C-alpha cells in the first residue's frame, strides 16, 4: 500500500477513535527513519493533552491497527502532542489561534503590503477570510497570504 493510502486510512481510523474520546487528530507522519518506518500521530484536546492521554491512544490505536492489518511494512507507532510549535492544518485552526504568533512558509513568493517579496512570514495571526490568511508582521505591515499558497504554518512560542 502506498504511503498516501496508508495516511488516508490511518486518518479515518484515528479520527473515529479520537472523536469518541473528545480529542482531535492534528497531524500524521508516516515516514522512513533510518531503516524503519515510523507512524506518528499528533493529537490534542481542549485543555491540552497529557502523557496518560497519549499512552491510552497509543494502546487503543495499536489494537485497531493490529485488527485492520493493512500496513505491510514493520513500523513503530508513536503518539504525541503537537508541541509548542503546533502546525496549523485546518481552516478552523486559523480562527482558533487568532492573535497568536505564527510562522508561515509559502510555496511561491508572496508580497506583503510594503512590497517586500518573500516566502517566510512571522507575525500575529489576524484570521482567515475568503481563503486568505492575514498576518500583522513583526515589522508592522500586514501580509495577506492565499491559503492555497501556504506550504507550512506553525504556532511560534514567544519567550
Curated annotation (Swiss-Prot):
Alphabetized InterPro entries for the sequence: Ribosome_maturation_RimP (IPR003728), RimP_C (IPR028998), RimP_C_sf (IPR036847), RimP_N (IPR028989), RimP_N_sf (IPR035956)
Stored SUPFAM superfamilies: YhbC-like, C-terminal domain, YhbC-like, N-terminal domain
GO CC aspect terms: cytosol
CDD domains hit by this protein: YlxS_C (cd01734)
Chief location category: cytoplasm
Subcellular localization(s) per the UniProt record: Cytoplasm
UniProt KW keywords: Cytoplasm, Ribosome biogenesis
Domain of life: Bacteria
One biological process term in Gene Ontology: translation
HAMAP family: RimP
PANTHER family: RIBOSOME MATURATION FACTOR RIMP
Protein family (similarity comment): Belongs to the RimP family.
Main function: Required for maturation of 30S ribosomal subunits.
Protein name per UniProt: Ribosome maturation factor RimP
Lineage of origin: Bacteria, Pseudomonadati, Thermodesulfobacteriota, Desulfuromonadia, Geobacterales
Gene: rimP
